[in-house]
Amino acid sequence: FNMVFLRIVLNFLVGFILVLAVMPKAIQYLKKLKFGQVEREEGLQSHKAKGGTPTMGGIVFILCAVVVVYILNFTSLNNPYIHLLTFSFVGFGLVGFIDDYLIVVRKTNDGLKPLYKYTLQSVVAIAFYILAKFFIPGFDTAISIPLLHIEIDIGWLYPILVYFMFTAGSNAVNLTDGLDGLATGLSMIAISVFVIFAISAVFRIPTTALSMLLASMILSNGRIKHLGP
């Protein structure tokens, strides 16, 4: 258990330091390319001053997280969990990239249309379930109740749960991302709880899965440093 915990902490620290080292240069480069946020005309007057704030910083967070997880867990690359979790991580990051890119190109605050965005999110969520079902050894439809060590097989409800876990979670972050630091703070609280739950089941959950979870915390902490208030 001590080695697993050390591995988790190492993933977090290395990733966090990497984000802090890379992000300043990335911000300068994004400013040079004029990849800035466009504020709505009907928005608050105080928000108008934020126009031009570099966007697409999520590219750095995701790349740093994935690089750290793969390098520090190179001995576990035969484990399908790490590739599956990376797929979902990068998949939703790609949806966000397309959304931001359209905002920059069009010079308006309208990125992907809601229907298109939800469709892409749905594709990633459904693909995740299909890949898990066919490539994860011993895949089943049981869910674990954290700390109580109780498992309940929910059968056909499982794919529905997975679908809404991804789509609802993604949109929840989007909705809270309107105020500086709000999505970051809430994400850190939620992810910290998941880390505690995962550590409580450390002997049943691959450490690569925990490492990917910590990669999310790298993203959240990096956002506090560079995008927070």
Predicted regions: what is each one?
Residues 1-37, 41-229:
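"…together with the soluble PPM/PP2C metallo-phosphatase catalytic core" -> "…together
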